UniProtKB/Swiss-Prot annotation:
SUPFAM superfamilies: Fibronectin type III, Growth factor receptor domain, L domain-like, Protein kinase-like (PK-like). Its EC number is 2.7.10.1. It comes from the Eukaryota. It is a single-pass type I membrane protein. This is Insulin-like receptor. The chain crosses the membrane at residues 1184-1204. Residues 970-1183 are extracellular. One of its GO terms (cellular component) is neuronal cell body. Changing S573L: In e1368; dauer formation above 25 degrees Celsius. Enhances dauer formation in a tatn-1 RNAi mutant background. Residues 944-980, 1718-1742, 1769-1826 are annotated as: Disordered. Tetramer of 2 alpha and 2 beta chains linked by disulfide bonds. The alpha chains contribute to the formation of the ligand-binding domain, while the beta chains carry the kinase domain. Interacts (via cytoplasmic domain) with shc-1 (PID domain). Interacts (via kinase domain) with daf-18 (via C-terminus).
Length: 1846
């Protein structure tokens, strides 16, 4: 092995060791392929090298923003993680999901055979084998969890948490610089990372203590999910969150700060950059006061938030700091997105263009990615997300995935995580921890959670692992580590006496029913935050408050409907000693309690005030319901409903004209006919500048007693000369009001009048208008960085844009001489390359623009200087008593830049900051939100003022407004429409802007206004006002100019006057760019070897232009220059076609160098890669070499023939044997198509008859062969023809023909013979042996209808002789033994697939699912096919493994079908329950009724759970052959030619089979009621039916006896025993009556797979059809035979009699019965009445719902009297009459409570009409307005006057 290979191997080995030390994930103990491992190592090594290069590059160019670095680093990190996961292993956590050995234990490692390694093999092969044995990435995404993380004070300092999960295996993260968590279970906080505490300390230590840098912060490269809150607060030096959390996908929000899940607050240097974040599952977003943080409002936060708690509070603080920091947040596209499919887009309203689509950006280079599956339409619920290609992830994913359709590749789980996979819910034996993952009970109880620095007991109850109890449970007072189930409904009492001012506090009382104390709610937030909908559920459980209810300042509340269950306020304490309910200062409250709420107050009154949207009529409704008189002080009509539209008179205002500095309004005059006209003063027009159109703006916004943001103009009312009012009113605002161009104004009109009786006010809605454009000021041009092919220019926006600046026009042109002039004199003596100097540039200049004066005829908006000059004129204030001194103008210019703060916003911000500091300094609990919340009874001064009800300040209409002057420069326009300049010299521009890759600039079309010059329109959305002119020539002088233009689609728009800013600038040169590429230098000999022509390609990019080239010919020996040629790059000269010529060269070795000279100077020297060899030709010519190659090829051909002959001699026989085997096993050579062979028949060989059957995979027809002989020599006439019903090209059709292929290999007596295949027609036909009697299952079921058969007598062998039964079982076993000998697995052995011919011989058929097992012990199918679940073994159900032993299991099920005459296996169970019954519970079918122990032992042998414990078919044939006929022995495959003899050790012994549950129970003389075991109501099963054989109908006793009455046979019956096992719980599986009447099994095509039609008279009805006498009238004799009951002691109820002769079964909702329509004469199907109750006129019925018909009242009375006498005899049984328990086996349970029936529940109270109704099932037809339905909760007998005994 070479030294280089050794070095490479050692290097790879070192990489693996390093990866193992980093401990990123577990390893798997299986091998991987050579290619995969090599690629993984190669990729890792290459990525590490690239990463080092990038790091070195960033060290030198750290000031350049690299937008692609993050993606490259992420890809590298992901590849490293894959290799690390495949090599390393971490320790086991309580959740075993971290261990990859869960499914591949270490003891089962794949062994490697090294015997083939020869001694000559190098060490490389051995190392590769060892490498492949250990490198195997896990199939699932491994989860590594961390608890809550708090980084504080220093970037690397992780503080210990007070609140922990208490995981004993939790790892301490202190001191780590890189945390490898994938999930943080809790919140992650970065706070107070400040180098200096105060500004004085910062100034003092600025030079000694620089701020922290980005590289010092801890990184989380693998973190995908934070289950709590992400908080970044007061952190310096942190520039980009992308570098800290490069893969963060999901923020859970299970614990919130206030109601926010993402908080970024007061961070001076931060950029968000969380471009992978796709889901915020709960909570809102608050991002404020971050001075340099841009793009906060470009993200669609509402799209990320999936819950109704979606309050978003973000600002763009960088815009307010523009004059201080010089930073302006850019607008526009951040990534190129053709077709708008890659990025997400926001829709913003624009007055001129309507709705505008704006690209959502995280930064200037990264947009918010779009995924069609983040939300599921049309519900908009959370979706699974997308993978990297945009495809839909698995439904259990959230936030995206690595691979589609793979629940193990999710970034986060939608529901629950368990063992590396996302699942819907935990299994029954597991417990849900933290609402996200499953743990075992032992793992749960190991946890010791710490809440508030105190350990609390953990509990594992009802599938929940938590410190609190689940719903319906409460803490056990005797043991606080346990929960106990509540008796009835849990009543949770919460002792609170604090303010509910945050959403987490509200969540803490979600389960509370009784509030012990005062409930004060003060939740601030946006109305559209969705909190109101969440609070609706939070307060829904409260029904009692012991104190008072106070709702104040809660903006999310629209109504108080969330207290829908509030019934009582005890008011033990009163608010202000007066009020039990207080509601005030709720700005959005529109309604009070729901009209259905039945609320009572024990004492106190109600106070409702200052709710501006609450109409007074709702207050009156509430007071009327509470029976409390209205009080004008407590329920003030004047302070409620001020902003609501309760009663109003609207004024419709129209705009008649709009100019740049004026707006004209008009409206109809106000109707004053019904008021005192002398009191009407006039109209006042209010207006103010607004940033945007806000449909929700109100008149009261931005107003106080001192400062009013609205300006106003008053117009006095005058009557006309005739005394009539003016029909229309006209007003305008103009230069005197300092109206500015292109400014949006809000306005409204209000009337002014003196208060008097009957006065009415008029007010208009708020409208919006934007003034017109005016010529903008010119921009100011500045120069920035210059590069070799680009010039970065910057400029300042016009001081007065006077319109929406849509774009800037940038023009540039070359100002350079042609290089061809210099090329003419390049090779002259005076211009040698050595003496050439660099070209000198003309002086670079900047042309200053002159300010443009606005014509004096127009009044413009005042500038800052003019406003300061008129300061004295502004010092005025409204004459309002108590008004504060006006300070709006006295404030400094810096303060004037900021908007006057809203008092309520200040209160909300203060509350948020207090809560934030509490959370940071006192971290909350991880397990849950604390129920004991700290007292928050603070009341601010603002709230104290608000609580002074009836003293709300009012604004006088005559007050003069103050004008707030903004001293900021106007911001650029946000318009994105394409301009069309009006300057004649400019060309038309394109309509749709594009985006420059890697920049923030949105561009329009580049055009060339003049020859040699270019221009481009740059969108004004680029708020940094800069542009990089790219694709410039290197080292070239350019002239640049700039102008600003407005939106040309708007009338009056224009560009700035032609005084454009200008500059001259030369681009930089590029070192070595003038070099000729070495590989392009070529040479060739000319006429002889002494003449060489050298050619090359010129440089593609040069520094300004090429003047010429210098070509040198050097000696290869000493490097001396032999010849030099100089050539100028003149016009028409070609270096490739012409080049230079060297002549008269001597023999030797030379190389060529070429030097290009550009405008900048001589470039580097380029040398040819191939040397020039000049020599005289020798012996080895081309002809000689070709002849030698020909001889070599001949010798190689001879050697190949020898090798071929040797292989044929040595290995020919083995290849032949393998070929023969593959012919016998065609499935090894399946090529997905059927090939016709000798079995092929012609279509006219058979005649197709009528259809005789249909199965899951096709139809069967009768056929007749036309004297045809099959390939096996069978001449056949009648035959069966199978035809597939699917598409001929489908996969099922191929499987159908493959079945025929399989049958070609079989030739035995007990397998259906194949006669041939007709594949030339569509659909194809398979011709088989005719089996006249059909399949075994249907044949057995047909025997049930035989009159000889009586199930109650167990006369099974009277129907099928015992020897015939043995014969059939032996024939099936012999056929399966034949398949077993051929290594074939049938996979679908069932009675339906066993066919019977006319001499009652059973043969095995239907090989559609058969598979070959020659090389494997079992067969595991792939794809999706129908499977016979009820005939499958446990290993087949769970693992999909099939072999001969699984067929043995199916044979046991076939025996069950035989002894039950074709009964459905596992009757009463669904397919999922069958899987649980067999695979999980490991149970088998209980012994059928009338089944002999011998056969049940054989069944149990076949149903052994372990496959190796089951017998083989060979053993079963020898066992059954002892009782079989001699004919069978003559035809048996096992007992004839093959002589497959068993050893003594292989013989079966039935005595070893357990006899449990096989012996018949002892029959008692009479049923004993006391022996019937009593069950609790919760343990009863309503599906417990009675076997049919226990009933026998007898003829009527006399003419008056009800035909519905049934009695017990004279034979004493066995008392039903209490079922105690899972087998006996499924009682329907124990009877031999066959399948239920309507068993629903939906799976595939026939009765065993899908729902089928059923026959009548099959199984008994449901047990609860009977009713006792005392169940209805308290022990009286009435209701003798209602609901199918009997009036005879000892007689049962109509359990076995069908409802109306098969019309309906009387069963509800269970799979055992089918609901069918019944005739109008029938009562409801659940009555269970006998068939004789119907079919007679509907007259003189004694009772409803199936009562027996009586011909007269006397007959009914006589029968009732007899029943009453029988009832008296039952008094010792608790007063019960004809009880259901008189019949053992009915499932009725006696009640321990005296006088009550255990089968029924009292639902009706006692009233004047009856004594109550314990029946739960309804009443007569006349209930429910005469409809035919019966009432579920009504009385059984309603009409008392018709009672015969009343």
């Amino acid at each position: 092995m070479t030294r280089m290979n050794i070095v490479r191997c050692r290097r790879r080995h070192k990489i693996l060791e390093n990866l193992e030390e980093e401990n990123l994930g577990p390893s798997c103990s299986s091998t991987t392929s050579t290619t995969a491992a090599t690629e993984a190592l190669g990729t890792t090594t290459e990525d590490m090298r690239l990463k080092q290069q990038r790091s070195s590059s960033r060290a030198t160019e750290h000031d350049i923003v690299d937008g692609n670095h993050h993606d490259d680093e992420h890809i590298t990190m992901r590849r490293l993680r894959l290799v690390k996961n495949s090599r390393t292993r971490r320790r086991t956590t309580p959740d075993s999901s971290m261990d990859c050995y869960e499914e591949n234990p270490p003891s089962q490692k794949t062994s490697i055979n090294y015997s083939w390694i020869s001694k000559k093999s190098s060490m490389t092969s051995l190392m590769l084998l060892l490498l492949f044995a250990f490198v195997q990435p896990c199939a699932s995404i491994v989860e590594k969890r961390c608890g809550p993380i708090d980084i504080r004070n220093r970037p690397w300092d992780i503080k210990p948490q007070w609140s922990k999960l208490g995981d004993p295996n939790e790892k301490d993260l202190a001191g780590q610089r890189m945390v490898n968590c994938t999930v943080v279970e809790g919140s992650l906080t970065i706070s107070f990372v400040l180098k200096h505490k105060t500004k004085a300390q910062e100034e003092m230590h600025r030079s000694l203590q620089p701020r922290y840098s980005q590289d010092e912060f801890i990184t989380f490269p693998h973190l995908r999910e934070i289950t709590g809150t992400l908080l970044v607060f007061e952190t310096e030096g942190l520039v980009d969150l992308r570098k800290i959390f490069p893969n963060l996908r999901v923020i859970g929000g299970r614990s919130l700060i206030q109601h926010y899940a993402l908080i970024i607050y007061r961070n001076p240097d931060l950029e968000i950059g969380l471009d992978k974040l796709s889901v915020i599952r709960n909570g809102g977003v608050r991002i404020i006061d971050n001075r340099k943080l841009c793009y906060t409002k470009t993200i669609d936060w509402k799209h990320l938030i999936t819950s109704s708690i979606n309050d978003v509070v973000v600002d763009n603080a960088a815009e307010y700091a523009v004059t201080e920091t010089g930073l302006m947040c850019p607008r526009g596209a951040c990534e190129e997105d053709k077709g708008e499919s890659k990025c997400h887009y926001l829709e913003e309203k624009n007055q001129e263009q309507g709705v505008e689509r704006v690209q959502s950006c995280w930064s200037n280079t990264t947009c918010q990615k779009s995924c069609a599956y983040d939300r599921l339409l049309p519900t908009k619920e959370i979706g699974p997300g997308c993978d990297a290609n945009g495809d839909r992830c698995h439904d259990q994913c959230v936030g995206g995935c690595e691979r589609v359709n793979d629940a193990t590749a999710c970034h986060a789980c939608k529901n629950v995580y368990h063992k590396g996979k996302c699942i819907e819910k935990c299994d029954a034996h597991l417990y849900l921890l933290l609402q996200r993952r499953c743990v075992t009970r032992e793992q749960c109880l190991q946890l010791n959670p710490v809440l508030s620095n105190k350990t609390v007991p953990i509990k594992a109850t009802a599938g929940l692992c938590s410190d609190k109890c689940p719903d319906g449970y409460q803490i056990n007072p005797d043991d606080h580590r346990e929960c106990r189930k509540c008796v009835g409904k849990c009543e949770i009492v919460c002792e609170i006496n604090h303010v509910i001012d945050t959403f987490p506090k509200a969540q803490a009382i979600r389960l509370c029913n009784i509030i012990d104390g005062n409930l004060t709610i003060e939740i601030r937030g946006k109305q559209d935050s969705g909190m109101a909908s969440e609070l609706k559920d939070i307060f829904a459980n409260i029904h009692t408050i012991t104190g008072y209810l106070l709702v104040r300042q809660s903006s999310p509340f629209i109504s108080l409907n969330m207290f829908r269950n509030l019934r009582r306020i005890e008011a033990k304490s009163l608010f202000r000693n007066l009020y039990a309910i207080t509601v005030f200062e709720n700005p959005n409250l529109k309604k009070l309690f729901d009209s259905t709420t039945d609320l009572t107050l024990d004492r106190g009154t109600v106070s409702i005030a200052n709710n501006k949207m609450l109409c007074f009529k709702y207050i009156k409704q509430l007071m009327s319901k509470l029976n409390i008189p209205l009080d004008p002080i407590d329920q003030s009509e004047g302070t409620n409903g001020e902003k609501a539209i309760c009663e109003d008179m609207a004024i419709n205002v129209s705009i008649t004209a709009v100019n740049a500095d004026s707006v004209f309004f008009s409206w109809p005059s106000f109707n004053i006919t019904d008021i005192d006209q002398r009191k009407f003063l006039g109209y006042e027009l209010f207006f103010k500048e607004v940033p945007r159109i806000d449909e929700n703006m109100t008149i009261e916004e931005d107003r106080s007693a001192c400062v009013d943001s609205w300006q106003s103009v008053f117009k006095q009312y005058y009557e006309t000369s005739n005394g009539e009012p003016t029909p229309d009113i006209f007003m305008d605002i103009g230069p005197r009001e300092r109206i500015r161009p292109n400014t949006l104004y809000a306005y409204y009109v209000a009337t002014q009048m003196v208060l008097h009786a009957g006065a009415k006010n008029g007010v208009s809605k708020i409208g919006f208008v934007r003034t017109s454009y005016y010529t903008p000021d010119p921009p100011t041009l500045a120069l920035a960085q210059v590069d070799s092919d680009a010039i970065h220019i910057t400029w300042e926006a016009p001081l007065q844009p006077n319109g929406d600046l849509t774009h800037y026009t940038i023009m540039w042109r070359e100002n350079e001489v042609s290089p061809y002039e210099e090329a003419e004199k390049f090779c002259t003596d005076a211009s040698t390359p050595a003496n050439r100097q660099h070209t000198k540039d003309p002086k670079e200049t900047i042309v200053a623009d002159k300010p443009v004066d606005i014509p004096s005829s127009r009044t413009v908006a005042p500038t800052l200087l003019t406003m300061m000059g008129h300061e004295d004129q502004q010092k005025t204030c409204a004459a309002t008593p108590g008004c504060c001194s006006c300070s709006a103008i006295e404030e400094s210019s810096e303060q004037n830049k900021k908007k006057r703060p809203d008092p309520m916003s200040a209160i909300e911000s203060s509350a948020f900051e207090n809560k934030l500091l509490d959370e940071v300094l006192m971290p909350r609990d991880t397990m849950r939100v604390r129920r004991s919340i700290e007292d928050a009874n603070r009341v601010s001064e603002e709230l104290e003022k608000a609580e002074n009800l009836g003293k709300a300040p009012k604004t006088l209409g005559g007050k003069k407004p103050l004008i707030h002057i903004s001293k900021k420069k106007p911001s650029s326009s946000s318009t994105t429409s394409t301009p069309a300049p009006t300057i004649a010299s400019m060309y038309a521009l394109t309509r749709k802007p594009t985006t420059v890759p890697g920049t923030r600039i949105r561009l329009y079309e580049i055009y060339e206004p003049l020859p040699g010059s270019w221009a481009i329109n740059v969108s004004a959305l680029a708020l940094d006002n800069s542009y990089v002119i790219r694709n410039l020539k290197h080292y070239t002088l350019y002239a640049i100019s700039l102008s600003a233009c407005q939106n040309m689609t708007v009338p009056g728009a224009s560009c700035s006057i032609s005084h454009r800013a200008g500059a001259l600038k030369r681009t930089k040169h590029i070192t070595d760019i003038d070099k000729v590429l070495n590989e392009t230098i070529e040479w060739r000999f000319m006429n002889n070897s002494q003449q060489v022509n050298v050619t090359w390609d010129p440089p593609t990019e040069v520094n300004g232009g090429i003047f010429g080239y210098v070509v040198k010919l050097k000696s290869k020996v000493d490097g001396s220059i032999v010849m030099t040629r100089c050539v100028g790059a003149k016009r028409g000269y070609s270096t490739r076609n012409q080049g230079v010529l060297f002549q008269n060269l001597a023999d030797g070795r030379y190389f060529v160098s070429v030097t290009a000279t550009s405008v900048h100077g001589a470039g580097p020297e380029a040398e040819s890669s191939d040397p020039i060899v000049v020599m005289t030709p020798g012996f080895f010519t081309v002809e000689i070499i070709l002849g030698m190659l020909l001889v070599f090829l001949i010798l190689m051909s001879i050697a190949g023939c020898i090798i071929y002959y040797y292989i044929q001699v040595r290995y020919g026989k083995k290849v032949k044997a393998l070929s023969d085997f593959m012919q016998l096993n065609p499935e090894y050579c399946v090529d997905n198509k059927y090939n016709a062979d000798d079995w092929e028949l012609r279509q006219d060989d058979v005649v197709l008859g009528q259809q005789c059957g249909e199965g899951s995979f096709g139809k069967v027809y009768l056929g007749t062969g036309n004297n045809v002989v099959s390939l096996m020599g069978d001449r056949f006439g009648p035959c069966a023809i199978k035809i597939n019903v699917d598409d001929p090209a489908s996969t099922e059709n191929l499987n159908y023909l493959m079945e025929a292929n399989i049958m070609k290999n079989f030739k035995t007596n007990f397998i259906v013979k194949l006669y041939g295949v007709i594949s030339t027609v569509q659909p194809a036909m398979v011709v088989m042996e005719m089996m006249d009697l059909g399949n075994l299952r249907d044949y057995l079921r047909s025997k049930r209808e035989d009159e000889v058969f009586n199930e109650t007598d167990c006369n099974f062998f009277d129907i099928i002789p015992r020897d015939k039964f043995h014969e059939w079982a032996a024939q099936i076993c012999d056929g399966m033994a034949y398949l077993e000998s051929l290594k074939f697995c049938h996979r679908d052995l069932a009675a339906r697939n066993c066919m019977i011919n006319r001499d009652e011989t059973v043969k095995i058929g239907d090989f559609g699912m058969a598979r070959d097992l020659f090389y494997h012990d079992y067969y595991k199918p792939s794809g999706k096919r129908m499977m016979p679940v009820r005939w499958m073994s446990p290993e087949s159900l769970k693992d999909g493994k099939f072999d001969s032993k699984s067929d043995v299991w199916s044979f046991g099920v076939v025996l069950y079908e035989m002894v039950t005459l074709g009964a459905q296996p596992y009757i009463g169970l669904s397919n999922d329950e069958v899987l649980n019954y067999i695979g999980m519970a490991r149970k088998v079918i209980k012994k059928p009724e009338c089944c002999e122990n011998y056969w049940y032992k054989v069944m149990k042998m076949c149903w052994r759970y372990s496959p190796r414990d089951r017998p083989t078919f060979l053993q079963l044939v020898h066992l059954l052959a002892a009782e079989a006929s001699p004919e069978f022995r003559d035809l048996s495959f096992v007992l004839t030619d093959n002589q497959m003899i068993l050893d003594d050790s292989e013989a079966l012994d039935l005595d070893d089979i357990d006899d449990t549950d096989m012996n018949d129970q002892v029959v008692e003389v009479a049923p004993d009621v006391e022996n019937v075991e009593v069950q609790s109501d919760s343990e009863r099963r309503n599906t417990d039916s009675i076997p049919l054989k226990q009933f026998k109908t007898i003829p009527p006793i006399n003419a008056t006896t009800s035909h519905s009455t049934i009695s017990i046979d004279e034979t004493p019956m066995k008392a039903k025993q209490r079922e105690g096992s899972l087998d006996e719980e499924y009682a329907l599986m124990n009877h031999s009556g066959g399948p239920s009447d309507a068993e629903v099994r939906t799976y595939a095509g026939d009765g065993d797979y899908v729902e089928r039609d059923v026959r009548e008279n099959d199984v008994p009805t449901r047990r609860n059809t009977g009713a006792s006498t005392s169940s209805y009238t308290g022990g009286g004799p009435y209701c003798l035979t209602n609901r199918g009951g009997s009036n005879e002691r000892g007689a049962g109820f109509g359990e076995a009699v069908r409802l109306t002769d098969g019309v309906g079964s009387g069963h509800l909702n269970d799979d055992d019965y089918v609901e069918k329509e019944i005739s109008s004469m029938d009562t409801r199907r659940s009555t269970g009445a006998s068939s004789s109750s119907y079919g007679v006129p509907q007259t003189n019925w004694s009772g409803n719902r199936g009562a027996t018909y009586y011909t007269s009242k006397a007959q009914q009375a006589a029968t009732a009297a007899a029943a009453a006498a029988a009832a008296l005899q039952q008094q010792q049984n608790g007063g019960r009459g004809d009880r259901l328990t008189q019949l053992p086996g009915t499932g009725h349970l006696q009640s321990t409570r005296g006088g009550q029936d255990g089968d029924y529940i009292e639902t009706e109270p006692k009233n004047y009409r009856n004594n109550g109704s314990p029946s739960r099932n309804g009443n007569s037809r006349d209930i429910f307005n005469g409809r035919s339905a019966f009432g579920e909760n009504e009385h059984l007998i309603e009409d008392n006057e018709h009672h015969p005994l009343v």
